[in-house]
């Protein structure tokens, strides 16, 4: 299937406990090196999710171009961000990024000819045990702290995970990861507007156009969504030219 022009395709997959037979089928999508790598993971659930996530990435890429799941090859940036190898990117012009948390895997795909395009996604499960005050002081910009300061405890925790998902999506897009100071940029939660794109029932709300500060970051575009129960997801991307990106959702089984 040819990817739509100017569309960001978002694939949402439930990460349920896989049956042994299904997991074996998924492992057939992997390269020998990947199977060897994942076999070294001692925690069974972590191992299963690693296999499932990589297999679903490969299978989903194969819906966009005439390559078998096992044929995709990846390169990695200095901080480990995966991308298609140069030859396959030239063939397909596909960009991707993925994130998983709890019971869900989120995968973003888009087609664009520029290798300079930057794409990042994050999905986060709200966690009541996280000491958000400590994290805020170390990793949030003054503008973000100001947004959170006057909120009641429950609302502050919700807003904290909104900001964390947005910040993660940004550093995943840049490929710098935690090597990039998290307090060196900020998102404005009061900005943005409702996103009218059709979406799965699991996504209860979606906003687009959340502002990224400082002002020189205006070419970036960000989205923030909420899921039940207690999940939020964020998408951030930059392209060399202004594009009115449209979201297209796909719910996996």
Predicted features along the sequence, with ranges:
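Core catalytic alpha/beta fold that binds nucleotide/phospho-ligands
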Residues: 1-253
